[in-house]
């Protein structure tokens, strides 16, 4: 049965080379499957799944996308993966995403979420093929005010715990890259670039 919801995208992603970091995670595996179904050539870059069974394994993603197992903290492996995939579009979802783990291993959280993102952004900057990049962070990037309404784009960055602080810092890093490198007047090639909170 054809998924009618995907029809609205037409051929936008057909035959596009797309690199997705964190494709073994829940959101990344769904995004990989969805883009594959839209005709994209998907390359995933991620650690091995950390649950058994994993969504990645249950949907057979390793059989339908190119998967490169790597830690985004290793810039050499990230750069090699970018050269292999030659992506036109990058979705960066890889992260240490657990607040509790951030208390137990704050350095790993900061190294992955900030340093790993810098490695991805540097690979985008060095690439001649990337036209667009999206970095996925979290609503935890905002200062926690405990109010009744949702956060807004112009709310201050913050974070009382290492995970939240790492996501706020990632937003600031992305803003610096957007302004310095990924615009028509910056020092690098024009790349359509955005962050989203999911």
Give, region by region, the residue ranges found by the protein language model:
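N-terminal Rossmann-like NAD(P)+-binding domain of SDR-like oxidoreductases, especially those catalyzing
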Residues: 1-197
